[in-house]
Amino acid sequence: KLDYEIYVTNGVFRGLDADGEARFGEVNGLRGSKSGYVNDNYNESPGIVGRVTFSPFIGFEFGGSAYTCRYDENNENQLTIPALDFTYQRGPFEFLGEGAYAFIETDNFAEAAGIPGDMWGYYLEARYHFMPSLLKSWSPRIFTDNSTFTGCLRWDQVQTAGRDDNFERVHWGRNRLTPGLNYRYTEDTVIKLDYQ
């Protein structure tokens, strides 16, 4: 099975204002630059996003996606984020992951504001789906045939970039291991607990 999609959207990143205020950085990566305001077209440049997925057999899927747009108010610098992902499920076991790399174009004005040239990150996650029969017999209204628990363990690694106190360009790496437990009452209702 092969699926694909492509969209043209309003650009959603507000990375560099005309007065030199940068919103990309080492603390929150690209997150602080998302606009999300109604009718907000910061630099009147569209964003283009696309995705292709391929599933050679039931239970396995891999895909690639990309997003690109101008990120600065002067409409002179491009942000491009390609990503790869996969999901493999066999019985109650599931393994998935995703990796992305942000290519950030920087002219002299963007460099002077401290905009980094790149950032990247990935995660790998293992899941196990289960439902103890004791719980189903104890309370069949709460623990139905459609309900399930999922134990998960996720490894994240992210590298953001910015400037240090001496205004030297540096990269910061973050690693995180996150165990978690989810209870899904129905497909659309889930309670999640995790420890970071």
Predicted regions mapped to residue ranges:
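Outer-membrane beta-barrel pore domains
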Residues: 60-196
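Aromatic- and glycine-enriched pocket-lining scaffold segments that form the walls
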Residues: 1-61, 65-69
